[in-house]
Amino acid sequence: MSGNRIQPRSVARLAAVQALYQMEVSGAGVDSVIREFGEHRFDRDVEGEQLAAADETFFADLARGVVTNQAKIDQGIVKRLASGWRLERLDATARAVLRAGAFELMYRSDVPTEVVINEYVEIAKSFFEGPESGFINGALDAIARDARD
C-alpha cells in the first residue's frame, strides 16, 4: 500500500496548480494563497482520510516562481500554441497546469524533464477526460526543448 502513496512533491505540484487557478479566478495574491494552503489545506483530514503530505517549500517555490516569471513563462507557452491561438483561449485550469510545468522546465533544471512532463500530464488527467492531457504533454515537451536544449 505504501508504494501507492503520493510523493510530497507530487502533492505540491497539484496544490500549485490549484493555487494558480485560485489566484487567477479570485484575484488573490500569491502570499495569501500560500498562507491559506499552509493553514487550511495541507496535512488535513478530509472525510476521514488523511491527505498525503505536501512539500510545502516546493509548493511555495512553484507558486511564487510562476507569479514572478509569468510574463516569460506565458511567452514560452504562447510560442507553442497553434497559430492564431491566444493563451486566454485556454481553460483556466489548463493555463495553470502549463504555467506550473513551464516554470519547472524553464527555471528548475534540478528536476528531470521527464519527471516534470509526466507529473503535469497526470495532473491534467485528474482534471480533464478529453484531449487536454495530450495537448499539455505536447506543449510541455516543446517548451522543454526550447528551455533545456
UniProtKB/Swiss-Prot annotation:
Keywords: RNA-binding, Transcription, Transcription antitermination, Transcription regulation. SUPFAM superfamilies: NusB-like (SSF48013). It comes from the Bacteria. InterPro entries: NusB-like_sf, NusB_fam, NusB_RsmB_TIM44. GO terms for molecular function: RNA binding. GO terms for cellular component: cytosol. GO terms for biological process: DNA-templated transcription termination; transcription antitermination. Involved in transcription antitermination. Required for transcription of ribosomal RNA (rRNA) genes. Binds specifically to the boxA antiterminator sequence of the ribosomal RNA (rrn) operons. Belongs to the NusB family. This is Transcription antitermination protein NusB.
